[in-house]
């Protein structure tokens, strides 16, 4: 599995960058925001999410870990694929998107190409509670994703996350959350 690339930007388009790494050129899907920050000939380090499908092996690239985490979370929402998740990241930074979810601005979300009212509402419902407002947010988001990947529902996870002690390590938080969810 490819989780990162360090190489030279060979070619850039709106939603794709070609990165040359030791003689091999990788086609990486990127948001328009990321694309705008890249320059041909620039040495770059991208965080990669590799998605293997029946008919495709796709690489999605991110300059920031927060973008990658948000992208992964968006892919878990039924009806949101890579194209729509990239459109969201092209339209909003992770912080802007977090604000949109927190303030329930469905209309702004509907401005993203490919998102209608129904999908915007679904995204709002699924992401409420994903963005936790405290200094431990990145760790809490990782705990959320880990529990969700184990099959727990967003509502259950959010309820348990509110009860966890704030300074737990990610591992300890997952362990404690699992104990609460299984009891």
UniProtKB/Swiss-Prot annotation:
Keyword Cytoplasm in annotation: yes
Region (Domain II): 64-139
One MF term in the entry's GO annotations: four-way junction helicase activity
Annotated region described as Flexible linker, given as residue ranges: 139
Entries under NCBIfam families matching the protein: ruvA
Function: The RuvA-RuvB-RuvC complex processes Holliday junction (HJ) DNA during genetic recombination and DNA repair, while the RuvA-RuvB complex plays an important role in the rescue of blocked DNA replication forks via replication fork reversal (RFR). RuvA specifically binds to HJ cruciform DNA, conferring on it an open structure. The RuvB hexamer acts as an ATP-dependent pump, pulling dsDNA into and through the RuvAB complex. HJ branch migration allows RuvC to scan DNA until it finds its consensus sequence, where it cleaves and resolves the cruciform DNA.
Start and end residues of each stretch annotated as Domain III: 139-183
Protein name: Holliday junction branch migration complex subunit RuvA
Pfam families: HHH_5, RuvA_C, RuvA_N
CC annotations in GO: cytoplasm; Holliday junction helicase complex; Holliday junction resolvase complex
Segments for region (Domain I): 1-63
Family indicated by similarity: Belongs to the RuvA family.
Subunit structure of this chain's protein: Homotetramer. Forms an RuvA(8)-RuvB(12)-Holliday junction (HJ) complex. HJ DNA is sandwiched between 2 RuvA tetramers; dsDNA enters through RuvA and exits via RuvB. An RuvB hexamer assembles on each DNA strand where it exits the tetramer. Each RuvB hexamer is contacted by two RuvA subunits (via domain III) on 2 adjacent RuvB subunits; this complex drives branch migration. In the full resolvosome a probable DNA-RuvA(4)-RuvB(12)-RuvC(2) complex forms which resolves the HJ.
Species this protein is from: Helicobacter pylori (strain HPAG1)
Alphabetically ordered keywords of this record: Cytoplasm, DNA damage, DNA recombination, DNA repair, DNA-binding
Gene Ontology biological-process annotations: DNA recombination; DNA repair
Cellular location(s): Cytoplasm
């Amino acid at each position: 599995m490819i989780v990162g690339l360090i190489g030279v930007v060979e070619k850039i388009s709106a939603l794709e960058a070609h990165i040359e790494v030791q003689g091999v050129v990788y086609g990486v899907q990127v948001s328009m925001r990321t694309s705008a920050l890249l320059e041909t000939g620039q040495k770059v380090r991208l965080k990669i999410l590799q998605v293997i499908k029946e008919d495709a092996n796709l690489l999605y690239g991110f300059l920031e870990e927060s973008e990658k985490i948000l992208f992964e979370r968006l892919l878990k929402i039924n009806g949101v694929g890579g194209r729509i998740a990239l459109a969201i990241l092209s339209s909003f930074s992770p912080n802007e998107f977090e604000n949109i979810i927190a303030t329930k601005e469905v209309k702004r979300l509907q401005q993203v190409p490919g998102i209608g009212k129904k999908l915007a509402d679904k995204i709002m419902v699924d992401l409420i509670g994903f963005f936790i407002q405290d200094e431990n947010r990145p760790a809490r988001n990782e705990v959320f994703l880990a529990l969700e990947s184990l099959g727990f529902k967003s509502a259950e996870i959010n309820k348990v996350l509110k009860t966890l002690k704030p300074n737990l390590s990610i591992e300890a938080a997952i362990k404690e959350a699992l104990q609460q969810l299984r009891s």
